[in-house]
């Protein structure tokens, strides 16, 4: 049973070019399902029927899991069993007929322009850490790249003369422009700071931790949370918040949806269209608060 799950994980990485977060999420859902099966005396993933999956989803609901979690678990099982069917391991997909309650759409958290300015001002350029953090945050908001893409950047991916970065992810490459402030922050960091903190001359990573090695997701998460606290911003800021804000602010200022899709690296335009709904919701909230008859 574990072998099938491991093979599916490899398929997601190598064939579907899924992100590390997506793979981790799907495998976590599948392993939780596997544990539940073992606890209930079912040991073979290949002998599962639709009724079994429905019972598992009801079990998640009884445990107080949110509709979004239950829906995601169902999606993970549908994807896994679709893979099992396509691989010839199973004749049919038992999860295909599963129907879940539609989860209430949760829109991404967006920072206002003032909140972004306040957040980007937090790193103090008085030492190596301050210069590095300033460059990272400016780059993140300038490009809207994912945190996995940020920490995966190499020095050779940056062209400051032309003012862009080259971002390779999920088997595709895209070119994203930089505004002047981000170029300046990167120039200062690459020229004056990075050479002093890298552990070895052979280090290729653009951003390194204070031990001189490539920055980790966990390390960057701590940096984000630290500056949220010092800025006194009440909204929950995650590494993805600046990505969401980047897209929403571009759209708000008239950018073409297809251009935003290209910069974000979305395979499907529907993923980008969520920001249209975010802007509409914000306008409606403003209207309801300000209009005397609303």
Task: Give the ranges of each region predicted by the language model.
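Conserved catalytic core of the tyrosine transesterase superfamily
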Residues: 1-294
């Amino acid at each position: 049973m574990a072998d099938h799950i491991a093979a599916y994980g490899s398929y997601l990485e190598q064939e579907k070019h899924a992100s590390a977060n997506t793979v981790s999420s799907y495998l976590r859902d599948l392993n939780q399902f596997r544990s539940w099966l073992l606890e209930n005396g079912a040991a073979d993933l290949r002998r599962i029927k639709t009724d079994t999956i429905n019972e598992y989803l009801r079990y998640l609901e009884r445990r107080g899991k949110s509709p979004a979690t239950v829906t995601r678990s169902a999606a993970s099982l549908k994807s896994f069993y679709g893979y099992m069917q396509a691989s010839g391991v199973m004749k049919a997909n038992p999860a295909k007929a599963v129907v879940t309650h539609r989860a209430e759409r949760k829109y991404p958290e967006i920072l206002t322009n003032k909140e972004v300015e306040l957040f980007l001002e937090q790193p103090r350029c008085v030492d190596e850490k301050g210069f590095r953090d300033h460059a990272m945050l400016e780059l993140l908001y300038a490009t809207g790249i994912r945190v996995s893409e940020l920490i995966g950047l190499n020095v050779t991916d940056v062209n400051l003369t032309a003012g862009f970065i080259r971002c390779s992810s999920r088997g595709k490459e895209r070119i994203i422009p930089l505004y002047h402030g981000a170029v300046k922050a990167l120039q200062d960091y690459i020229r004056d700071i990075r050479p002093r903190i890298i552990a070895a001359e052979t280090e290729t990573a653009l951003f390194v931790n204070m031990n001189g090695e490539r920055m980790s997701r966990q390390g960057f998460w701590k940096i984000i949370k630290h500056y949220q606290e010092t800025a006194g911003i009440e909204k929950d800021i995650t590494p993805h918040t600046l990505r969401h804000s980047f897209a929403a602010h571009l759209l708000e200022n008239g950018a073409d949806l297809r251009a935003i899709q290209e910069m974000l690296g979305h395979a499907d335009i529907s993923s980008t269209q969520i920001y249209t709904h975010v802007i509409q919701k914000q306008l409606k909230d403003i209207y309801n608060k300000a209009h005397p008859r609303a």
